[in-house]
C-alpha cells in the first residue's frame, strides 16, 4: 500500500493547511528575494482542488466571459478556474510568446521595466473578465493586466490570487471599487 499523505485520498483542512504546502525559497530568483513556491500545493491533488474551489467560490454567481491568466503560474490557476467557472481563458504573456497581433502593457519592476501582452482580438469590447495570478507582491503585474484590459475596454469584475504578500502592499495599486481576493496572506 502506498503511504503518501500528499496523494489522492488525503484530506486537507483549508487555508491553514495549504499554507504548509507553500515553501519559501531564499535568494530566488535573485539575492534578497524570498520566493513563495506554490508547486508543492499544486502537486497535491486534493489540496490543489480544494484551494481552487476556495478561489472560485466568490465568483460562482458572477457572470463572466473569461478569466485572464497571467504568465506563468497564473496560467495554471487561471485555466483551472476558468474550467471550474465554465468560462473562457485568455493568456496574458511575456513579450514575443503569442502569435498574431498583440496589445502591450509596460510596467515597473524594482530595477527597470517589463512588459506583458495579450491578443488584440482576444475578447470583444465590454466582455466581463476575472484576472488571476498566483502571487500578489508589489502589484505591478496585476496593474499591467488592468492596463491591457482597459485597452480592450473589458469590464473587470475582480481579481483572484492564491497568495498575497501583505508587506509589499501590492493591493494599493489595485482598483478600490473592484474586488481583489487572496486565498492566503503572508
From Swiss-Prot:
Question: InterPro entries under this entry?
Answer: Ade_phspho_trans, PRibTrfase_dom, PRTase-like, UPRTase/APRTase
Q: Write down the SUPFAM superfamilies for this protein, in alphabetical order.
A: PRTase-like
Q: Which GO terms describe its molecular function?
A: adenine binding; adenine phosphoribosyltransferase activity; AMP binding
Which reactions does this protein catalyse? AMP + diphosphate = 5-phospho-alpha-D-ribose 1-diphosphate + adenine
Provide the protein's localization: Cytoplasm
Pathway entry: Purine metabolism; AMP biosynthesis via salvage pathway; AMP from adenine: step 1/1
Quote the EC number.
2.4.2.7
Q: What is its main location?
A: cytoplasm
| GO biological process terms, semicolon-separated | adenine salvage; AMP salvage; purine ribonucleoside salvage
Give the UniProt keywords, A-Z.
Answer: Cytoplasm, Glycosyltransferase, Purine salvage, Transferase
Task: Quote the function comment for this protein.
Answer: Catalyzes a salvage reaction resulting in the formation of AMP, that is energically less costly than de novo synthesis.
By what name is this protein known?
A: Adenine phosphoribosyltransferase
Q: Which gene is transcribed and translated to give this protein?
A: apt
